Amino acid sequence: MTQQLQSIIDTAWDNRASLSPAAAPKEVTEAVDHVIEALNNGQLRVATREGVGQWTVHQWIKKAVLLSFRLKDNVLMQSGDLNFFDKVPTKFAGMTEAEIAATGVRVVPPAVARRGSFVAKGAILMPSYVNIGAYVDEGTMVDTWATVGSCAQVGKNVHLSGGVGLGGVLEPLQANPTIIEDNCFIGARSEIVEGVIVEENSVISMGVYIGQSTPIYDRATGETSYGRVPAGSVVVSGNLPKDNGRYSMYAAIIVKKVDAKTRSTTSLNDLLRD
């Protein structure tokens, strides 16, 4: 079934210029709808983990997400007295109290998750935003005004602090999703974008910005890397000298490895997860 879906999606992607809500083969619309539903219930995900820092990205699923926008018209959506005009309904729209309770997710108003995102049991959505294609795993808290971008992957027992932004893949178009692995703590107002991977058990301090072009400097080894924060790192914002000290440029600095003291200040509160 998956191979058949992939074949239909790949072919539709190659012919996407000819597609519209009024002019799309039935098998294409059904295939795209099937993928979005599978993303919504966690049966499919845009990327799957093979090991620490090792992920396989399923580009055909990302293509299906993009195609869904071409195949749908904007429609009126309502929430109380508020009107919206969009192509993607919210994840919990039309669900009963019992159905939402069965998901095991706590959703604090006015949090929004779009249909086609997955939020696992034990996760908490404070007033935040989870975009289509994103995956939020068990026990994770998405704190107030945090944004989980399209197709971003967030692991188990992660804390995304207030105002954190995880970049999406839809616009500007990115090849790979942003990934936060298990047991990470992302400090307030930090931004992780452009397919950067933060490996498991890492702590990103407040106000750290990491994209593919951001130098990630390890002060213990003197090494500079890009696009990946090694497992168990504690990262703060800083600067590196350039041009023989004439000026400095922004960098993310690995100041140490996570220790017991770090864990005590970034541990999750079980009382919030009862």
Curated annotation (Swiss-Prot):
The keyword Ribosomal protein does not apply. Its EC number is 2.3.1.117. GO terms for cellular component: cytoplasm. PROSITE patterns: HEXAPEP_TRANSFERASES. The keyword Acyltransferase applies. SUPFAM superfamilies: Trimeric LpxA-like enzymes. InterPro entries: DapD_Trfase_Hexpep_rpt_fam, Hexapep, Hexapep_transf_CS, THP_succinylTrfase_dom1, THP_succinylTrfase_N_sf, Trimer_LpxA-like_sf. One of its GO terms (biological process) is lysine biosynthetic process via diaminopimelate. It is an enzyme of class 2 (transferase). GO terms for molecular function: 2,3,4,5-tetrahydropyridine-2,6-dicarboxylate N-succinyltransferase activity; nucleotidyltransferase activity. It is found in: Cytoplasm. It catalyses: (S)-2,3,4,5-tetrahydrodipicolinate + succinyl-CoA + H2O = (S)-2-succinylamino-6-oxoheptanedioate + CoA. Keywords: Acyltransferase, Amino-acid biosynthesis, Cytoplasm, Diaminopimelate biosynthesis, Lysine biosynthesis, Repeat, Transferase. Pathway: Amino-acid biosynthesis; L-lysine biosynthesis via DAP pathway; LL-2,6-diaminopimelate from (S)-tetrahydrodipicolinate (succinylase route): step 1/3. Belongs to the transferase hexapeptide repeat family. PANTHER family: 2,3,4,5-TETRAHYDROPYRIDINE-2,6-DICARBOXYLATE N-SUCCINYLTRANSFERASE, MOLYBDENUM COFACTOR GUANYLYLTRANSFERASE. This is 2,3,4,5-tetrahydropyridine-2,6-dicarboxylate N-succinyltransferase.
